[in-house]
Amino acid sequence: MRKVLFVFALCASIATAHAGGLMTNTNYHIAFDRMFARGATTEIDAVFSNPAGLAWGHEGWQLSLNFQKPWQNRDVEIDINNFLANPAAGNPGATFHKKYNGEASAPIVPALFASYKKDRWAVSAMIGIVGSGGFVEYDEGVPMFNVPITAKMYSTLYQKIAGTPYAAQADALARDFILDSSMKGKQYIYGGQVNFTYRIIDCLSAAVGFRANYYDGYYKGHVTAMPGQKISSMVGNNPLMDLQLDCVQRGWGFTPIISADFHMNKWTVAMRYEFRTKINTENDTRVLTIGLQGASGYSVTDVKAMAEQNGNAAVIAALSAPDKLGDMAGKMTDYLPNERVRYDMPSLFVAAVGYEFTPGLRAATEFHFFDDKNAKMGGQRQEKLSHGTYEILAGVEWDINEKFTVSCGGQHTDYGLTDDYQQNTSFACDSWSLGLGGAWNINEKIRLNASYFCSLYSDYNKKINNAYGTPYTVDKTYSRTNNVIGIGIDYRF
């Protein structure tokens, strides 16, 4: 039954592999991508960045349609000394080094903005991908699966072969299996936001709004260990182990938003606060099975069917027996049918200052604080952060003439990461981001924006003793790259 425990523990780890992350996006409009510090803007992108600032925006209707194409790598590199060492067989093991390449991408990401202003009043709305946002795939699996399965398969086969006439070859034969593993997942939070803005006095405005958020995610993966040609005659042609998972999670949440803007002469000072958004997703578990080679041959356990027939609580209780999963059974909960898993979006505080040096030269600085430690994640992962996310932004914009504008900006992000927070398929790295781009005023009504930005991440190094239930120490490096290009059209009626 130890093998069953091990495989169920792997299944549970899938639950947290994508269970969290720092969930909020801020780049919806191309003006952000090319300048970053947009918290004091009064243009159409203020629908998100500074709703109160629309009190000084364009009189009448304006629309904006934006498209972005991001691409990113999320890589995990590991080193293990004396891997699969077996002193009893005279094998000291070997140094194992591998880089697991995770390709993260999203299709063309659109965002639509609209606003209408009349005198002191403005009403505005936007639709976009407001959180998470992307797809990641590890074609060769991830070390949290591959390392312990490799170690376990070797140990199990060695013990089994050691009691046969092939005992002298047990060390070599126990390595004769083929591991096939892959992991992929998706997380999108779609949002629709509405704001109401009022200029209270000539230099001060306020806005209230709310955003409806729809979370749509899935987690799919498999880990299959097949016997090699040398040992298939001993164990048959069925898998030594086969784990399959397909789980979809969906849920809703609503975000109240308040903002204020002080605007006098060349200065703009703005603040915005978004309240924490509770998103409680419900599982649609489509596949959750485990196939194992046992004393009586190969058999498959349909964990999903067990839960649907007997209820999730009964399944957890049964799996908690000492000869089954024991204390690990509780970690299965996040994947069982109809269970609920939290993916809260944190509260967000924004303060920004903008200054107009000349009618054609503007600059801004901005501060963000995401209270991630109080936004619940699956497995209470938020408690493992040392603090919420801090961001410092700055940008400058210059009108070359009436037709063309150029801008650039930067952003530094500090997530408050710890070793316990980082996971193979859901990890973060502190970063510096740089963006640039421009705008072309095609005529009095139409403006074309274009941008490019990249994020330069700091590698995160982590040492794990007795990693994944094995006797090995794993040195792990998390690394990321990120690039985004964008284009958008602003239209004033």
Where are these regions (language model features)?
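Sec-dependent N-terminal signal peptides
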Residues: V4-S13
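Intrinsically disordered, low-complexity segments enriched in glycine/proline and serine/threonine
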Residues: L5-F6, F36, L65, T277
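Active-site-proximal flexible loops/turns
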Residues: A9, G57, S458
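N-terminal, post-signal peptide beta-strand-biased segments of exported outer-membrane/organellar beta-barrel
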Residues: A15-F135, F453
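Outer-membrane beta-barrel porins/channels
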Residues: G20-A37, T41-T42, V109-P110, K117-F493
